[in-house]
């Protein structure tokens, strides 16, 4: 089983990052993709991935929250990092109109620029979309035939949005959000509609600790070692065997990020 979304650069992991990776391995997690969300964190993610060869890989990009930072120097840094063997996708990039920490115009400019970098380098994109679906799809669609793959990370949309993502050929990342009995029920109902070969799984650690973990962890911090729990729950709600689903999503991740 492969965790396609871990924010291992987070300060929440500062004191025990090595132990977090060890616990993930002990739990049966076979690989981790470390998320880059701005130029500095993408650099940190790349260095962490290089510290754990053949177990950790990373993305390089600028999250929509940080899109106001986008300029030619940042673009050059992302280009440079993308040439490293351990950097396997451009992102986390996309649109987030929920809180607009960067203006929609700044987000769209950074998103378009990163799609262009991914197309130029023939790399997959690791995507973020929140409260911006129609604009997100309209921006992304013209680039899709020039990209080897596109992953919509931490999908929390509705049935119409899922159908549009699938029709566009996107891979769909599901997190422990689906384990939330308050907010995750709509997403849970959508799980059977995602073809097995388009499904990816992720913790988004240290965020989105599954609310149904028992016994409840002392800390609210999420970790990649909880990925098996998320997979077991997803498998149950899809009516599939958890071991098979873990293996299938692992194969999907290695195919999409060209790790096989």
UniProtKB/Swiss-Prot annotation:
GO cellular component: cytoplasm
Keywords per UniProt: Cytoplasm, Exonuclease, Hydrolase, Magnesium, Metal-binding, Nuclease
Localization in the cell: Cytoplasm
Membrane-crossing residue ranges in chain numbering: none
InterPro entries noted in UniProt: DNase_TatD-rel_CS (IPR018228), Exonuc_TatD (IPR024918), Metal_Hydrolase (IPR032466), TatD-like (IPR001130), TatD-type_Hydrolase (IPR050891)
Coiled coil: none
Record-listed E.C. numbers: 3.1.11.-, 3.1.13.-
CDD domains, per the entry: TatD_DNAse
Binding site for a divalent metal cation: 92, 128, 153
GO MF: 3'-5'-RNA exonuclease activity; magnesium ion binding; single-stranded DNA 3'-5' DNA exonuclease activity
Gene3D superfamilies in the record: Metal-dependent hydrolases (3.20.20.140)
Cofactor section: Mg(2+)
Top enzyme category: hydrolase
PANTHER family in the cross-refs: DEOXYRIBONUCLEASE TATDN1, TATD FAMILY DEOXYRIBONUCLEASE
Oligomeric form and interacting partners: Monomer.
Entry function: 3'-5' exonuclease that prefers single-stranded DNA and RNA. May play a role in the H(2)O(2)-induced DNA damage repair.
Family: Belongs to the metallo-dependent hydrolases superfamily. TatD-type hydrolase family. TatD subfamily.
NCBIfam families xref list: PRK10425.1 (NF007745)
Protein name (database record): 3'-5' ssDNA/RNA exonuclease TatD
Organism listed in the record: Pectobacterium carotovorum subsp. carotovorum (strain PC1)
């Amino acid at each position: 089983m492969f965790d396609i979304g871990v924010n291992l650069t987070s300060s929440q992991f500062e004191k025990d990052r090595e132990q977090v990776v060890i616990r993930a391995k002990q739990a049966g997690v076979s690989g981790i993709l470390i998320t880059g969300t701005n130029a500095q964190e993408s650099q940190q993610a790349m260095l962490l991935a290089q510290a754990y060869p053949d177990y950790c890989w990373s993305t390089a990009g600028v999250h929509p929250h940080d899109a106001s930072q986008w300029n030619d120097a940042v673009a050059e840094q992302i280009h440079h990092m993308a040439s490293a063997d351990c950097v396997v996708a451009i992102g986390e990039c996309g649109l987030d109109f929920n809180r607009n920490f960067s203006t929609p115009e700044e987000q769209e400019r950074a998103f378009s620029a990163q799609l262009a970098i991914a197309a130029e380098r023939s790399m997959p994109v690791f995507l973020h979309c929140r409260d911006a679906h129609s604009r997100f799809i309209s921006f992304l669609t013209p680039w899709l035939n020039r990209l080897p793959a596109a992953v919509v990370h931490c999908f929390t949309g509705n049935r119409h949005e899922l159908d549009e993502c699938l029709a566009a050929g996107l891979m769909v990342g599901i997190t422990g959000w689906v384990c939330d009995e308050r907010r995750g029920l709509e997403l849970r109902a959508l799980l059977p509609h995602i073809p097995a070969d388009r499904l990816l799984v992720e913790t988004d650690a240290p965020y989105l600790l599954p609310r149904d973990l028992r016994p409840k962890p002392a800390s609210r911090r999420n970790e990649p070692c909880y990925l098996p729990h998320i997979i077991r729950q997803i498998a149950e709600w899809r009516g599939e065997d958890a071991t098979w689903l873990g293996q299938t999503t692992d194969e999907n991740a290695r195919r999409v990020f060209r790790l096989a």
